[in-house]
Swiss-Prot record:
GO molecular function: ITPase activity; metal ion binding; nucleotide binding; ribonucleoside triphosphate phosphatase activity
Cofactor note: Binds 1 divalent metal cation per subunit; can use either Mg(2+) or Mn(2+).
Subunit structure: Homodimer.
Job description of the protein: Phosphatase that hydrolyzes non-canonical purine nucleotides such as XTP and ITP to their respective diphosphate derivatives. Probably excludes non-canonical purines from DNA/RNA precursor pool, thus preventing their incorporation into DNA/RNA and avoiding chromosomal lesions.
Family affiliation: Belongs to the YjjX NTPase family.
Stored Pfam families: NTPase_I-T
Keywords: Hydrolase, Magnesium, Manganese, Metal-binding, Nucleotide metabolism, Nucleotide-binding
Name by which UniProt lists this protein: Inosine/xanthosine triphosphatase
PANTHER family xref list: NON-CANONICAL PURINE NTP PHOSPHATASE_PRRC1 DOMAIN-CONTAINING PROTEIN, PTHR34699
Catalytic activity: XTP + H2O = XDP + phosphate + H(+); ITP + H2O = IDP + phosphate + H(+)
UniProt key word tRNA processing: no
Gene Ontology BP annotations: nucleotide metabolic process; thiamine metabolic process
Length: 67
């Protein structure tokens, strides 16, 4: 979950990237570690999580056990 102060700004229509940049001081954070990287202190990265999501989503198409 997002911290309430960040969630409120997103609910008001602001994009998450600029809001996170404002609070972290990291320019263009969305092109770097992303909010996920900040919230997990670098344990997870934005690109790593997206990679895993795509692999999991495509696994039924590449594994005979699903047929």
């Amino acid at each position: 979950p997002l911290p309430e102060i960040i969630l409120n700004k997103v609910r008001e229509g602001e994009a998450l990237g600029p809001v996170m940049s404002q609070y972290t001081g990291i320019d263009e954070i969305g092109r770097k570690e992303g909010a996920i990287g900040v919230f997990t202190k670098g344990v997870l990265t934005r690109s790593g999580v997206y990679h895993q999501a795509v692999v999991l989503a495509l696994s039924p198409f590449h594994n005979a056990i699903y047929r």
